[in-house]
Amino acid sequence: MAIQIVLIVGPTATGKSRLAVDVAKRFNGEVVSADSMQIYKYMDIGTAKITKEEMQGIPHHMIDIVEPNEEFSVAEYEKRAKAIIKDIHERGKLPIIVGGTGLYINSIVYIMHFSDFEGSKEFREKMKKLAETYGTSYLYEKLKEVDPEAARKIHPNDLRRIIRALEVYEFTGKPISHYQKMSGMRKNPEYDPIMIGLNYKNRQLLYEKINRRVDEMIKNNLVEEVVNLLKIGYNKYGTSMQALGYKEIVEYLNGEISLEEAVEKIKKGTRRYAKRQITWFKAYDFIKWFFVDDYKTYEELRENIFEYLAGKLKF
């Protein structure tokens, strides 16, 4: 019989982590993160990682599992997350997958064959060296040649995603956009997914929330966090340090831009990322959307979601 899983998805800054904890408490569950940046140790502020206090004693998996200089593929995520889901289920608890990384979610709900593609660290290193020598734009032009569809969706300065798209094409012969299309993909029969999407009807409210969150990160010493990571010896060209919120602070520390400019770049980049996430999650035909601004309080939103889940879950 298929394992019932709850997935809580949506753009950044919509309150997914908080809701996941409440759902876990109400329905006897454990949380599995589906966030490609929260897997990294020591990167807490810039990734808006849930704190021990916020977890309220609920076990959280797939957080703080790799060093910032380590590579971590979707195939690796799929393998580990599926083993954890199985274990949670076998212990009689509800697996709750929460996060905004679309490919991580896809690796669970669809048959993706990610595990057939491990990629190549050598290839990624070679691409990073080319970017250091000729600039990110050189690789972006290459991507436009082999996968114009992916190039349209990826920002010209997003080195991490550019390299990933080139790598997929290099080793599978197919563009990454091929793997990102949900139409025609087969659902994974191992799972019976109940997917909840959190969003705002008023996009401006979401953008304001994002801006406030970035200001909070700066207040909570994001700059210091990046300084410490660089001191430990993590390379500014490493996968993790190319992440949104980190690469801009590195630019500031290198004297390339002011702190104000770095903050604005993070806000703009995060708003753009949220837009991409919304587009991605709208493609799921089995998602049930809940709009935060439809409710007067968080408690009202939470109770509505509890009611919906109670009608769907098989106890």
UniProtKB/Swiss-Prot annotation:
ATP binds at residues 10-17. Coiled coil: none annotated. The record marks 101, 124 as: Interaction with substrate tRNA. One of its GO terms (molecular function) is ATP binding. It catalyses: adenosine(37) in tRNA + dimethylallyl diphosphate = N(6)-dimethylallyladenosine(37) in tRNA + diphosphate. Belongs to the IPP transferase family. This is tRNA dimethylallyltransferase. It comes from Caldanaerobacter subterraneus subsp. tengcongensis (strain DSM 15242 / JCM 11007 / NBRC 100824 / MB4).
